[in-house]
Amino acid sequence: MKRVFLMATLLAMTLFSASAQEKEKRCIQLPSWLDNLKLSGYGMTQYQYIGQEGAKSNTFNIRMARIALEGRIAGDFYWKTQIQFNGNTSNLGSSPRMVDLFAEWQKYEMFKVKIGQFKNPFTFENPMHPIVQGFMSYSQNLSKLAGFSDRAGEHASNGRDIGLQLQGDFLKNANGRNLLHYQIGVFNGQGINTKDVDNQKNIIGGVWVMPVKGMRIGAFGWTGSYARKGTWNDDEQGNIVYQKDAAGNPVLDEEGNPKKETFSGVRKLSQNRYAFSFEYNVNDWTLRSEYIHSTGMAFAKSITNHGDANSKDCNLNGKIGNKAQGVYALVIAPIVSKKLYAKARYDMYQANGKTDMMRTQYEAGLNYHISKNFTILTEYALINDRTLQKHNYSMADVEVCFRF
């Protein structure tokens, strides 16, 4: 009996070993760079009420839904790709699209090299996660002057472009904390998922000091152009140009109206911007303020689809001219640390650099972090828009956000 039991045990062990070896042969050996592959994502659902006269609305919305893959290769190289998949495919503003695809060599803390599609190195708020940023939208000056819904007429690009960037931290103090950060990059200047049009690159960069823990004081610069290929009928100030005969008299059409001149080719608009930034995170409080100034004309119509007429319309927006500026200041204060926060923001933007087109948002609300990965954002805003006949109206916003 013992002999039979021993033989059965040996047979079972042999079969188990053979089965394990067979399974091992069938397994696909993943490359080492996939060992630390990370999948992440987040969603932001939204309800928003707008009380503007003649344009009142209240609607549920998917503000944002993204999924990302990231990892490291050979220790020194970090890579990431991220897709935004909410919206529809009718236009570039809300259609699914790739927002990030880059690799960065990170061997040295003071000298890192990044290439691909990623955030413009401009302002403190631009690279912030939208849930961490904490309000119903990024500030107006950031949205219009950092590549989101840019005043120049560029398609919605989430503050990003395609290019090459250098950055680093150095000058450590006695506690080993870096006191200085720099970042500078060369970009196409056309926004995400788009090749260069005028072969002139944008140079964008910034530097900030960190005198005490949690504090940053920075300055940023942006110089370059935004271009389109198409047709236009106006001069460099946005004034319509009419045809004239050899004697200098207006050329009229069949109905007796003056005929417009038509120009064609690549039209590029210089863009020169700078920003000053301050941020202080201390004892669970957040204080931040940024001022941005811009010089440069804008196209009259923004691109929503690269195949439609707007993408080839190179006429200028003479109404807003060649200047713009804006500033915001915000505070996020703990009521219950790590859980419940009160917030307030002053957010002002001048589309033409003057008060007659000034739009100001006075905002207040609460943020409740149910857990590390689940947050509810609430907000009320009083809007003063001087371009409207009735300047003042209210907005309310509630967002339920999750991430993994």
How would you describe each model-predicted region?
Residues M1-M44:
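N-terminal periplasmic/intermembrane-space "pro-region" immediately following the signal or transit peptide
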Residues G51-A55, A74, F102-Q106, Q117, ...:
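Outer-membrane beta-barrel pore domains
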Residues R26-G189, V197-I204, W208-I217, T223, ...:
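Outer membrane beta-barrel
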Residues A12-M13, F85, F124, A300, ...:
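Alpha-helical transmembrane segments and their juxtamembrane interfaces
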Residues G185-N193, K229-T231, D235:
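Active-site-proximal beta-alpha loop/turn segments in soluble metabolic enzymes
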Residues L15-F16, N88, P130, I303:
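Residues in and immediately flanking transmembrane alpha helices
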